[in-house]
Amino acid sequence: MSSTTEWKVPAANQPRTGDYAFDLDHVLASVVGLHSIVPNDAFSADNLGTERAGNGVVIDDGLILTIGYLITEAEAVWLHLGDGRVVQGHALGFDSESGFGLVQALGRLDLDPVPLGSSATAEVGDRVVLGGAGGRTRSVASHIAAKQEFAGYWEYLLKEALFTYPAHPNWGGAGLISNRGELIGIGSLQLEREREGKSEHVNMVVPIDLLKPVLEDLRNFGRVNKPARPWLGMYTAEIENKIVVVGISAKGPASRAELKAGDVILAVKGEKIISQTQFYRKLWSLGPAGVDVPLTVYHEGVTFDVVLASIDRTKLFKGPRLH
């Protein structure tokens, strides 16, 4: 959902100033709209599109924290402020492990940074606000519904993600604000869960504590200054204790090895795999990007061994250009 279109969160889900121990309007003013343009030939264009929109949160003078998929390979970024101004930005950095992205404003924002809180001390049941650009009418009064491991199908794993309910309809890059007015996470996804026999939406939020060890690297180098994890370029799902390939990324090692959707990953380097989290942890334990990854695969009645030469996924990305 674009941050620039006219819409409002249902009134019943909007935060009310008297319910929080901080200046709600002042903090929410530092959540900005974000709009990016990505080249048609970018690696991420097929999956994420060439025009992306969401939110970002001012965390330092001219520095905006967002979710990385909004700015990956962006050639142009604009920041939409609450007073109607539009300021150009520069995609400064992206951390593929956490999913965080940083944008540097190329003009004055005149907005106070939102202080960083602690996601570790946040507890299930805590009252929070998932803040979107546009103030209270585009923000959601939520609570922390769960803190638990999250495995994404795209070779992504969080040890302890935050899940909030009710869900924000424009969750990408939204700021999770604690009852102290501090930033404790950034919105990433909307998921469905079953509760009391009914299906309901929740947001998955990347916890802010994952930013603190990598923030300076992202500011200085645009990425975390350590060897990248090995990447195979396969999308998988955990189905009945089996890891099933549901898609293959073009140009990735899995594509070159001619793995197909429907294949089942039985083992990594001889270790039987029964969960997505186990699969990722075993894969990443083999070494940095470039390491050979021996897999045992089941394909249409045949079991075979294959070795994939892993790569650094970010090497496929177009680098940002400073205008």
Question: What label would you give each PLM region?
Answer:
Residues 1-24, 111, 137, 183-239, ...:
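C-terminal cap/linker of serine protease catalytic domains
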Residues 7-11, 39-41, 51-53, 58-139, ...:
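Conserved active-site neighborhood of the chymotrypsin/trypsin-like protease fold
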Residues 31-35, 64-68, 123-134, 164, ...:
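Active-site-proximal beta-strands of protease catalytic cores
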Residues 49, 70, 112-159, 192-199, ...:
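Flexible, gly/ser-rich surface segments that form the specificity/activation loops bordering the active-site cleft
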Residues 60-65, 180, 184, 254-277:
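Conserved PDZ fold ligand-binding element
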Residues 70-72, 267-296:
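PDZ domains, with a preference for the canonical peptide-binding region formed by the helix
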Residues 106-114, 139-201, 230-232, 238, ...:
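Active-site region of chymotrypsin-like
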Residues 118-121, 174-175, 180, 247, ...:
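A short glycine-leucine-enriched loop at secondary-structure breakpoints
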